[in-house]
Amino acid sequence: MSVMITILNGPNLNFLGQREPKIYGTETLEDIEKNCREWAKRADVIINFYQSNYEGQLVEWIQEAIGLSSGLIINPAAYSHTSVALLDALKMFSGPKVEVHLSHIYRREAFRHHSYTSIGVDAIISGCGSDGYRFALEYIAKQLINCKR
């Protein structure tokens, strides 16, 4: 199954490993990317892995993934609580989509309990740390296999 999955990471995730390790863990975004690429290689999946602190760039990457990628994973970080633009872009992507959060957003401050972007995805994985990315990859791969049956 050679398919492409786009993985997008939002603001401040480039500081993983340094930023609030009690909440986000000690792994860096580079560690997470390496683990995703290792999983993808075993599963014969191609991944595009991106990070931006800019909402418009994330929107553009979602738009680029339309027609190019079979699935999409997004950790919108703080934009999940504010971005209708990301929600609208996610709604345009027709393949399986998963929102990932390293921390358990419902055990944090009340303003983090609402996610606009979650309306535009098929599943949310929250509170599993970096394993959430692997769970999302496995979910999307399974959805794509089931679609081919």
Swiss-Prot record:
It comes from the Bacteria. Pathway: Metabolic intermediate biosynthesis; chorismate biosynthesis; chorismate from D-erythrose 4-phosphate and phosphoenolpyruvate: step 3/7. It comes from Bartonella tribocorum (strain CIP 105476 / IBS 506). This is 3-dehydroquinate dehydratase. Belongs to the type-II 3-dehydroquinase family. It catalyses: 3-dehydroquinate = 3-dehydroshikimate + H2O. Pfam families: DHquinase_II. Transmembrane segments: none annotated. Catalyzes a trans-dehydration via an enolate intermediate. It is an enzyme of class 4 (lyase). The active site is at residues 24, 101. The record marks 19 as: Transition state stabilizer. GO terms for biological process: amino acid biosynthetic process; aromatic amino acid family biosynthetic process; chorismate biosynthetic process; quinate catabolic process. InterPro entries: DHquinase_II (IPR001874), DHquinase_II_CS (IPR018509), DHquinase_II_sf (IPR036441). GO terms for molecular function: 3-dehydroquinate dehydratase activity. Its EC number is 4.2.1.10. Keywords: Amino-acid biosynthesis, Aromatic amino acid biosynthesis, Lyase. Homododecamer. Substrate binds at residues 75, 81, 88, 102-103, 112.
